[in-house]
Structures are given as C-alpha cells and as structure tokens.
C-alpha cells in the first residue's frame, strides 16, 4: 500500500489549463504537465483496495494499485514495467482515455477519486525522459512474416506484440503516414503528433 492515510490527507489535484491567451497562439495540448513529485503525492492517495474496482473499470485491466504504490515510493523503473505489462502505449491512453478507472475508484465512494490517468501519463513521460522505454527484442526469430492491416492504435499494438514474439511484421495503411486515428482523428490540442512520432521512432529501432 502507498500512503495509508494519503486519501485523507492529500486532496485530489488535476492539471491546470494553460492560460487562454497562450493557448490561442498555438494548437498544443491544453493542460500543463504536472511534476513527478506532485504525482507521487497523488499516487499516495491510492488505498490498494482488497478488491480494486479500478481493474474492472479499466478496459486494459491495468495493474493500477501496483504502479501507484511504486510511483509513491519513487521506483520509476519498476512502475513503467508494470504499466507496460498491460498497456503498449500509456502515453496515448494517458492523454485520450476517458478514465473509467477513476469512476470505479473505491476512494470516490466517499471523496474524490485518485488521479489515475495523470499518474499513468507522468509514469510513461518520466520513462521516456530517463531512457527507460526500450525495444523488447525477441530471443529468436520465428521465420514467419505477418501483415497487419491498419496502423491505428490496435494495429500498432498488434505489430509490437507480434514483433516481440519473433515474427517479422509489415504494417499496411491506406494513408500516407502511419498512425491511423492517432494521426488523423485526434486534434493536436488533445495529443500532439510529436508524441505519436516519438513512439514510432522507438518501435522502428
């Protein structure tokens, strides 16, 4: 468990919006990033429930109490390992997911929920900053080639998992650039294209 009294002593704090007079000059993301130290305190609000309903609320089944505890303790390396165990692209979901896990959070029964989405986002951003997002190379190649049709988030996740299993993967898309919905359906103020390109660079190494 993280901080046993964290949910009582630490109030929920969500990221602040950038000033309007600044936002109207660009198409960058609306919210200001929160510091790692700030998110450590927010992670301490997790109760590590006996039955963590956030698991059932999360479509991916993310191991939320585990990486909340690791972030609170400052173990960023193990935290990103636990996050990547169930989520190929937390930098996408940390920005775009409507966070049903927070609605399911047990803390929310009597007070405000843990800021799970922001903790997830800061965990992956810290991992990129520290160089802890590295390709997982297969021990051996299977000699099989797999075609993935469509380069949206599902196609990219499939390609990543198949590559890790040792297959040679070719991704096809009708558009000029890879990314699908992430590139052509999500506006820049929700997720900047540089975030997608950063992950694609990591996947093609």
Q: Where would I find each of the regions flagged by the language model?
A:
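N-terminal Rossmann-like FAD-binding beta1-loop-alpha1 element of flavoenzymes
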Residues: 145-170
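Ferredoxin-type iron-sulfur electron-transfer modules and their immediate structural context
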Residues: 1-145, 193
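Glycine-rich FAD pyrophosphate-binding loop
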Residues: 167-183
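N-terminal Rossmann-like dinucleotide/flavin-binding domain of flavoprotein oxidoreductases
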Residues: 80-87, 119, 182-205
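Generic beta-strand/beta-sheet core signal
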Residues: 49, 149, 172-174
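Residue-level detector of alpha-helix initiation sites
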Residues: 88, 110, 152-154, 177
